[in-house]
């Protein structure tokens, strides 16, 4: 309880009222990292970059977990449950002036009351299986994400997204399923070449009240008529 983490300038990077994790020992002996649960409650994280030449104040944490050791074991991570409650995160690029029009500023973000519930079933070099059961965020300039959920399973040559839902105060987006397939990219291929070989199909239902996005697009402040869309889409390589 009451965990404090300082950055290299001796400023508070993170303060958590409660931080807990439970690690499964037996999988660790087999070269796997299996964490039963991670809990982070009542937390404030202050992230910043003081100048264009300076590194972000959290860079030293990323450097700690990075490695140039090519003989290390392949990535194999499982986290049974991730719980975040009452988490506030700020991000400031300190040399850039703040916007004054009351809209969201990506250089000076303040995210409040973040709540998250997720299950990372598998994370390997060639696969990802994650279930997001809850994500809610309030942004200081008025944007509110009431909830976001999805199930994502990605392998070497295919991916599947199920139960993708976004809920705003007066809007919703529902994608029951997206299925996609692709060829493994060659070592000399680029992103554009790879994306041209992706096949995809799915369904989408959307009801959007533009004023829900007024903190991003100010002209939407007076838009009070909902936009409704139901569609099936297919992309063939």
Model-predicted segments: where are they?
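Short, intrinsically disordered, charge-balanced linker/junction segments flanking boundaries
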Residues: 13, 28, 222, 230-237
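Transmembrane beta-strands of outer-membrane beta-barrel proteins
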Residues: 162-165, 203
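Short sequence motifs at beta-strands and strand-loop junctions characteristic
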Residues: 142, 223-225
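Repeated loop/turn-to-beta-strand initiation elements of outer-membrane beta-barrel proteins
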Residues: 158-161, 237
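N-terminal amphipathic/hydrophobic interface segments
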Residues: 1-6, 130-135, 145-147, 159
